[in-house]
Amino acid sequence: MTSKKVHVMVVDDSMVARSMIIRGLSAHPSIEVIGYAINTLDAKVKIPKLNPDVITMDVEMPGKSGIDFLKEYLPQHPIPVILVSSLNLKVFDALDAGAVDFVRKPASQDNMDAFVTTLTQKVLIASAAKVRSTPATAGTSPTQAPHLSAAPLP
């Protein structure tokens, strides 16, 4: 019995980073990288054709950022996205935009193995995520959406 591989699309404008991510993810027997995009415009065209289970996306790219792309695209097309960036300050923006997780790009080659291991684990977890579309009529951002709050303790 063979299990279905997780189909991943990599979106990154840096050829070096893109190649590293593709090579690292492809080394796992349960993951198949089915394509890549060099920016968000390219991603918008390729995502419907490739139909990935999970997308890894750089945050900072020319044109539209990964975060802006998620805010525009994810409400109508729910796909688990893991944002990848060298900027830790973008973590909350990424999650607020709908990313299921965030991975920090390594600052040096010394941390590459740990980065690939972390990203691979998060891709496998994200593949099981149930991402819901947001109704177009909602008119609220994720930070404005209703949330649960705990009652004060007695």
Spans of model-derived segments:
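Strand-loop microenvironment adjacent to phosphate/nucleotide-handling motifs in alpha/beta enzyme folds
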Residues: 1-154
